[in-house]
């Protein structure tokens, strides 16, 4: 039984999310275990002694996508204890309304945050560079996209750990002798792009062209992969942004 004199904000917010999204059967504490279907089309034989992708390269692939967190009056991240209370982490929400809910939890439990705490956006490339510096974060995905991921993973619909990302080989772009593979945080955005490039992708068959994986797992694959392995081709498309517009900005 939880003590009435202590508050574990990670556990408290996890219960809040589960209360509103209990059908998704996922818990915030379980996102340490990275799972999900890998985007296997990018796995190739790795050359010996090849250089791995640099943090700047990985960060560039993440540019443009914003997440939301809570900061105090000094614009510092409001950190939470992990499930064991061993370390502090920052919570990053893919939906602003989830960050607002977290802010309400913080204000109700911590008097010092009632006046100056606020929700602030931060881009994923900035988050990644902070991670490189040793700051720990936990992502809270969009529950709609969790539902989409579970529907695509027909063989295992029990749970999905991490942030879902979606990809299709039909949308690979080749320009300036380079290959770019867009990865989406929104299944709906991917379906819209597929509807423009392939007649066969319309209607019921659209899911046949879509692969789903965990953002955290894909990110780890990028960090551990060498150049020319295929993982350096990935470009993450911000939710709601047009595929062509973002690719032009990245390629420029």
From Swiss-Prot:
Family annotation (InterPro entries): Tic22, Tic22-like
Transit peptide location: 1-50
Pfam families recorded: Tic22
Keywords: Chloroplast, Membrane, Plastid, Protein transport, Transit peptide, Transport
A single Gene Ontology CC term: chloroplast intermembrane space
Keyword Chloroplast: yes
Origin superkingdom: Eukaryota
GO biological process: one example: protein transport
Localization terms from the record: Plastid, Chloroplast intermembrane space
Bilayer disposition of the protein: Peripheral membrane protein
Biological role stated in the UniProt entry: Involved in protein precursor import into chloroplasts. Imported into the intermembrane space via the Toc translocon. May be involved in the import pathway used by proteins without a cleavable N-terminal pre-sequence.
Domain notes for this protein: The N-terminus (1-54) is necessary and sufficient for targeting to the intermembrane space by an import pathway that is distinct from the general import pathway utilized by stromal preproteins.
Assembly and interaction partners: Part of the Tic complex. Interacts with TIC20 and with the Toc complex. Interacts with TIC32 during its import into the chloroplast.
Assigned protein family: Belongs to the Tic22 family.
Protein name: Protein TIC 22, chloroplastic
Organism name: Pisum sativum
